[in-house]
Amino acid sequence: MIRILARGLAYLHNFCFRACNRVLMYGYLQKFRSAGEHVLFSPLGSVLSYSTITLGHHVFIANRAWFSGEIEIGSYVMFGPNVTILGGDHEFKDITQPMFFVKDNQQRQAKIKIGNDVWVGANVTILKGVEIGQGAIIAAGSVVNKSVEPFSIVGGVPAKKIAERFTQAEKQAYISHSHHWSK
């Protein structure tokens, strides 16, 4: 009996959480600098600096995302759970005060750009100034501190190139068929 009740409560909790997330998502979409069509994300479980983020069409951001800074995300982009994107860092060379009290300034910020058709795996951290090229894949658990070439598969800490997603001929065919990315 207790098991049945526990399962029922778990189902009810999941249903309510998902329903609240959907309702809130539509309200929070207006807070982004701009957002394309068919954007899905979880406002209840994420921390996003909405006013500095630009989203393309068909973007999926899984639970527990932390996006901070000037971020431009293309179309057809998927983010796994627990992805962190940090567009800045803290000043640590001010000898007049502890790091705790030093406020972020513009010199410590750098825009992050993520191209079209990118897949970012779970638990990935992307640091300031990085540009991720079209068609790239970032393996789960990676820390991306340098730009990623188009159609590359990268992974590790720090992220390094593992493989190419396509051969040169496949890249050309892909590019000739990707005219709909801007729609």
Residue ranges, per PLM feature:
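Conserved beta-hairpin
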Residues: 40-42
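Residues that flank catalytic or metal-binding motifs in active/ligand-binding sites
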Residues: 81, 140, 150
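Flexible glycine-rich beta->alpha loop in the catalytic core of nucleotide-sugar glycosyltransferases
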Residues: 90, 142-143, 149
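Flexible, glycine/small-residue-enriched loop-and-beta-strand segment within the central core
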Residues: 45-55, 60-130, 157, 165-166, ...
